[in-house]
C-alpha cells in the first residue's frame, strides 16, 4: 500500500510485496489464462477493493481504529476517482496515482474483447478491467464489496449512492470508447438481470433502490447453477413483502436439490486436477443461501470474501458457540428499515433450549424494543437478548433496531 497516492501498488501481492511485472509463471495454464501474459499488473485496480474484507476481519477481531480508518480512506479514494469519471470506477490507476497511466491503448492489450479498430479509453483498461474479459462483472463486483464494507463500518449512505450510480450506468451501458465510425463502445453485460443491485435495497430498505425489480413476477425463476442468486433473491424480497408465501418451502426444496446434484457431480467427477481448482465453488455440496435468507435475514455473501450483512445472528449459550441450538428453528418472514419479524421454535419434545439473538451478524445494530404477537413491547437498548424455549414451544417476535449504529465486532455476546 502506498499511502501517498492511496493505492495498492499491484493486482498481485504477497509476502514479497507487490509484483510489478507479470511473467509466464504468474499466468501459466491453458490458453484461456495465458492471454494475460505480458499484460500490465502494475498499479491499482478495483479488484483490490476486495482486500477491504481482509482488513475488516482485522478490525472485527481487534477493534483497532487504524483498520477502520484505512478501509474508509482507501474506499473513499476510489469514490473520488469514480466521481471524476462520470461515476464509473476506473479499471486502473498508475503507480503515480493517475488513472489510465499504464494502459494507453487497452484495445491493443485485449484483442478480441472489443470491436476491431476501436479507440478504448485508458481508464477502461486494467487486469479484469472494463475492456477485458468479464470486466462488467469483476469491476462492479469488487466495487460492491468495498462499498459494502465501508457502509458496514459507518452506515454512511454515500457508499450506497456510489454503488447505485455505477450500477445505473451499467444498466444504461458504460461507454468505454468509440469505434472508427464514431459509434460508442458500451459495456452492460446483460444488466437487465442486475443481480448485484439487490444489495442496495436489502441493505438500506429504501424503495428507490428497487429499479431492478421492475416487472418481476415471483416464482418464475428456475433452479440452476449459473444465476448468481438473482431469481431466488428477488423471490425472497417478494416473500418479505407478502407476495410469495410459498417461498420458504420452495427454497428449502431447491437447496436440498442443489446439495444432491452437487454430491452426484463429486461422485461422478472426471475432471483434471487443474480444472478442479476452478470448479470447487460450483461443486461444494454445502448450501447455505436458504439458511442465510430465512434465518438471518441476510443475502448469502459472495464467494469473493464478502461479509454477512444481515439482521440477526444466533448463539447457543449452553455449548458456547455460534449458531442455533439443537432442535431450534428460525424463520424471518418480514423486514423493514427498523424492524425484523422472526419466529423461533423448539422442536425438541423433552428439552428446553435457550437461544441468544444478536442484532446484526457482527452486532452492528442496536436493539430497541422486542415484542411478541400477543405481548407488550419490552425496551432492551442492547445488542443481544436471550429467549428460553420450552419443549415444543415457539413464538413470533417483532424486533426493533437502529441499524448500523454500532461498530461491527466478531466478539461473541458474552
Question: Regions from the language model: what does each represent?
Answer:
Residues 1-375, 379-414:
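Glycan-recognition and catalytic cores of secretory/periplasmic carbohydrate-active enzymes
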Amino acid at each position: 500500500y502506498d499511502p501517498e497516492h492511496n493505492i495498492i501498488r499491484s493486482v498481485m501481492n504477497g509476502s514479497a510485496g507487490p509484483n510489478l511485472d507479470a511473467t509466464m509463471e504468474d499466468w501459466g495454464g491453458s490458453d484461456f489464462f495465458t492471454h494475460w501474459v505480458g499484460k500490465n499488473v502494475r498499479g491499482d485496480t478495483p479488484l483490490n477493493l476486495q482486500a477491504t474484507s481482509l482488513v475488516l476481519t482485522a478490525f472485527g477481531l481487534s477493534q483497532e481504529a487504524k483498520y477502520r480508518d484505512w478501509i474508509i480512506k482507501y474506499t473513499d479514494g476510489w469514490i473520488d476517482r469514480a466521481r471524476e469519471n462520470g461515476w464509473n470506477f476506473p479499471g486502473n490507476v498508475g503507480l503515480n496515482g493517475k488513472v489510465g497511466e499504464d494502459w494507453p491503448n487497452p484495445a491493443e492489450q485485449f484483442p478480441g474483447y472489443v470491436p476491431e479498430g476501436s479507440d478504448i479509453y485508458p481508464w477502461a483498461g486494467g487486469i479484469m478491467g472494463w475492456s477485458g474479459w468479464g470486466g462488467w462483472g469483476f469491476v462492479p463486483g469488487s466495487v460492491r464489496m468495498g462499498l459494502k464494507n465501508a457502509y458496514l463500518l459507518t452506515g454512511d449512505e454515500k457508499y450506497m449512492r456510489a454503488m447505485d450510480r455505477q450500477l445505473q450506468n451499467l444498466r444504461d451501458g458504460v461507454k468505454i470508447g468509440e469505434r472508427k465510425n464514431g459509434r460508442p463502445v458500451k459495456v452492460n453485460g446483460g444488466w437487465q438481470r442486475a443481480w448485484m443491485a439487490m444489495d442496495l435495497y436489502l441493505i438500506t430498505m429504501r424503495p428507490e433502490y428497487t429499479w431492478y425489480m421492475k416487472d418481476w413476477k415471483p416464482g418464475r425463476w428456475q433452479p440452476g447453477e449459473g444465476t448468481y442468486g438473482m431469481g431466488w433473491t428477488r423471490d425472497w424480497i417478494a416473500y418479505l413483502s407478502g407476495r410469495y408465501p410459498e417461498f420458504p418451502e420452495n427454497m428449502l426444496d431447491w437447496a436440498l436439490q442443489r446439495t444432491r446434484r452437487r454430491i452426484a457431480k463429486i461422485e461422478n467427477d472426471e475432471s483434471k486436477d487443474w480444472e478442479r481448482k476452478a470448479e470447487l465453488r460450483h461443486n461444494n455440496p454445502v448450501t447455505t443461501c436458504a439458511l442465510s435468507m430465512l434465518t438471518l435475514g441476510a443475502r448469502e455473501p459472495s464467494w469473493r470474501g464478502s461479509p454477512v450483512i444481515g439482521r440477526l445472528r444466533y448463539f447457543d449459550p449452553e455449548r458456547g458457540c455460534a449458531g442455533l441450538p439443537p432442535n431450534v428453528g428460525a424463520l424471518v418472514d418480514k423486514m423493514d428499515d427498523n424492524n425484523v419479524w422472526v419466529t423461533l421454535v423448539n422442536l425438541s419434545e423433552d428439552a428446553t433450549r435457550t437461544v441468544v439473538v444478536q442484532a446484526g451478524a457482527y452486532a452492528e445494530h442496536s436493539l430497541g424494543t422486542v415484542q411478541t404477537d400477543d405481548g407488550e413491547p419490552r425496551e432492551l437498548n442492547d445488542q443481544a437478548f436471550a429467549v428460553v424455549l420450552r419443549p415444543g414451544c415457539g413464538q413470533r417476535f417483532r424486533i426493533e433496531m437502529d441499524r448500523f449504529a454500532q461498530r461491527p465486532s466478531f466478539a461473541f455476546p458474552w
